[in-house]
Amino acid sequence: MLKKPIIIGVTGGSGGGKTSVSRAILDSFPNARIAMIQHDSYYKDQSHMSFEERVKTNYDHPLAFDTDFMIQQLKELLAGRPVDIPIYDYKKHTRSNTTFRQDPQDVIIVEGILVLEDERLRDLMDIKLFVDTDDDIRIIRRIKRDMMERGRSLESIIDQYTSVVKPMYHQFIEPSKRYADIVIPEGVSNVVAIDVINSKIASILGEV
């Protein structure tokens, strides 16, 4: 195991391909100690609120996340200690009662729409990536994902996109692009960018 694990931040708009880029990196190092942690796992617990109140949550605002807890757990992993990561239930709009045990790794990919927005998170990262994808492509992907995986209606998705997702993208997410070491146009289909990133990771891991 490396003396100090490396942390890679991957961000971009909702439906922009962040997870696909992260998984492409994971798949490129099948024999390495590497894991992905999603900022979405750290949405705040809302079990004390009524369901009607929960569904009004602005999930694209920094205050929706318990980023303090994420930072605490990342520091634990950097220190070589395992953590129990929360699991979020999107259908109930609150945290599940179960957690996921994550052991320390050599490479930790931190993925989420706002992971470059918080300076404290940025300070933990060795490589910062911004996946830059066309707005139309992102909304189409979001519709497919939320309908298939999260049981939402088309009307609710479009309403949320126009009233919350798009404004929050321009207020918080897009401005964080300036902190990225590498901007990846079109996400995982940009093979050259993925190869450059993988080469950098491989050099750190001593696999080249």
From Swiss-Prot:
<dbReference type="GO" id="GO:0044211">
    <property type="term" value="P:CTP salvage"/>
</dbReference>
<keyword id="KW-0418">Kinase</keyword>
<dbReference type="InterPro" id="IPR006083">
    <property type="entry name" value="PRK/URK"/>
</dbReference>
<keyword id="KW-0067">ATP-binding</keyword>
<dbReference type="InterPro" id="IPR027417">
    <property type="entry name" value="P-loop_NTPase"/>
</dbReference>
<dbReference type="GO" id="GO:0043771">
    <property type="term" value="F:cytidine kinase activity"/>
</dbReference>
<dbReference type="InterPro" id="IPR026008">
    <property type="entry name" value="Uridine_kinase"/>
</dbReference>
<dbReference type="GO" id="GO:0044206">
    <property type="term" value="P:UMP salvage"/>
</dbReference>
<protein>
    <recommendedName>
        <fullName>Uridine kinase</fullName>
        <ecNumber>2.7.1.48</ecNumber>
    </recommendedName>
</protein>
<keyword id="KW-0547">Nucleotide-binding</keyword>
<comment type="pathway">
    <text>Pyrimidine metabolism; CTP biosynthesis via salvage pathway; CTP from cytidine: step 1/3.</text>
</comment>
<dbReference type="InterPro" id="IPR000764">
    <property type="entry name" value="Uridine_kinase-like"/>
</dbReference>
<dbReference type="Pfam" id="PF00485">
    <property type="entry name" value="PRK"/>
</dbReference>
<comment type="similarity">
    <text>Belongs to the uridine kinase family.</text>
</comment>
<comment type="pathway">
    <text>Pyrimidine metabolism; UMP biosynthesis via salvage pathway; UMP from uridine: step 1/1.</text>
</comment>
<dbReference type="GO" id="GO:0004849">
    <property type="term" value="F:uridine kinase activity"/>
</dbReference>
<feature type="binding site">
    <location>
        <begin position="12"/>
        <end position="19"/>
    </location>
    <ligand>
        <name>ATP</name>
    </ligand>
</feature>
<dbReference type="GO" id="GO:0005524">
    <property type="term" value="F:ATP binding"/>
</dbReference>
<dbReference type="GO" id="GO:0005737">
    <property type="term" value="C:cytoplasm"/>
</dbReference>
<keyword id="KW-0808">Transferase</keyword>
<keyword id="KW-0963">Cytoplasm</keyword>
